[in-house]
């Protein structure tokens, strides 16, 4: 029995569709490689490391975000594919729960696909 791997554009389109529906955790569970590496633009913090290694660590990072932010709206644009990579733009209007501060943030994410799964993601945003 053989399995068919998703192409980069299929992975990209599925990720964007799921994120637009607010199903980010499902996207991670379905599309990310077991050994995914996720890199944030910032230096990290005591609560959240700059790097996450493995799907469980990426899911935990997403849970930390959800636990600490109320998302009022989100927009996802793209994908813009190139070979085994694609870029997606994410824009959020959120309130940081601990401080009560509301802000908008925009980030570009570069995803690399290997063997039909997202193997690496890197986020770019101003600090």
Q: Predicted regions span which residues?
A:
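C-terminal and inter-domain tail/linker signature
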Residues: 1-127
């Amino acid at each position: 029995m053989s399995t068919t791997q998703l192409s980069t554009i299929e992975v990209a389109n599925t990720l964007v569709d799921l994120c637009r529906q607010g199903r980010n955790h499902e996207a991670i569970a379905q599309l990310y490689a077991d050994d995914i590496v996720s890199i944030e633009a910032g230096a990290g913090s005591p609560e959240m490391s700059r790097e996450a290694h493995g799907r469980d660590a990426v899911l935990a990072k997403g849970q930390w975000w959800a636990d600490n932010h109320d998302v009022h709206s989100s927009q996802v644009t793209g994908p813009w594919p190139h070979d085994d990579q694609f870029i997606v733009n994410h824009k959020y209007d959120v309130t940081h729960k601990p401080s009560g501060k509301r802000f908008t943030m925009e980030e570009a994410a570069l995803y690399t696909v290997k063997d039909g799964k997202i193997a690496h993601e890197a986020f770019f945003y101003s600090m």
